[in-house]
């Protein structure tokens, strides 16, 4: 039987070495590349909530791999069930975590549950790699030659086991010579665009320029953006999409300027039991993230220490503002969504 304890597995941002789970600290990038132990449920939850490990697909994969490792070490089923529940509650918006853990829970019910959990965790990693490739294959067909594209937050190998979702599309388009430049929103308040996407695009050799979030409207008005590409943390049954805060603003701007707005995501991000965007739980984060900044580059606070802060991690983009949902199964059109593509199947 193949076991994680004897397997060295590595993606861009997580790895298993000598039977232990490690994550690349995404709070210290790009200044430092530091690997942190995520070998207990408590540690992994701390890393997830501190955004040291982030991205809807990657959160689900890291939780699944840790559960399989714990099973191989002999943790009893009852304790694994408790670990699964704790991990499920670590971040409420990203549905990939719930979907992956539902599959791990089914494996836990298997007669040979240790082997079943290992098999399922490895299968989830391989599936995510394949899903990223399929998304890119479909999405690249929508990219016109000599394109200036705009992206938000981080949707690459740092957020998945593969080449990424929206960034995967950009990579394949770049390899086909279709990209003139990518505009990278810095993505306030935690700067996932400025810290992570800029770093990834640089590593991939994709030409880009970093912008403040507030500059996107000006670029669109000048005709310097041909399409917007973003990822998703949850897709509701009516096609509404929850994604990093600021995504909705871009969708409104793109709609006004008649610019295509595409959402790239695996089918595992779809939640048929969630009727619409209003039903998606939106995580509220600590006020300190808005009043200042911290990371591998140090710490700075610019707002009054007692300033009241509103800090949702995500917003919801209505389906009416989306030009296409680029899934691993293909490009889903607004007409298909209106006809019930994302609705629960009886």
UniProtKB/Swiss-Prot annotation:
The active site is at 233 (proton donor). GO terms for molecular function: S-methyl-5-thioribose-1-phosphate isomerase activity. Coiled coil: none annotated. InterPro entries: IF-2B-related (IPR000649), IF-M1Pi (IPR005251), IF_2B-like_C (IPR042529), Initiation_fac_2B_a/b/d (IPR011559), M1Pi_N (IPR027363), NagB/RpiA_transferase-like (IPR037171). Belongs to the eIF-2B alpha/beta/delta subunits family. MtnA subfamily. GO terms for biological process: L-methionine salvage from methylthioadenosine. HAMAP family: Salvage_MtnA (MF_01678). The keyword Amino-acid biosynthesis applies. This is Methylthioribose-1-phosphate isomerase. It comes from Yersinia enterocolitica serotype O:8 / biotype 1B (strain NCTC 13174 / 8081). Pathway: Amino-acid biosynthesis; L-methionine biosynthesis via salvage pathway; L-methionine from S-methyl-5-thio-alpha-D-ribose 1-phosphate: step 1/6. Substrate binds at residues 54-56, 91, 192, 243-244. Its EC number is 5.3.1.23. It catalyses: 5-(methylsulfanyl)-alpha-D-ribose 1-phosphate = 5-(methylsulfanyl)-D-ribulose 1-phosphate. It comes from the Bacteria.
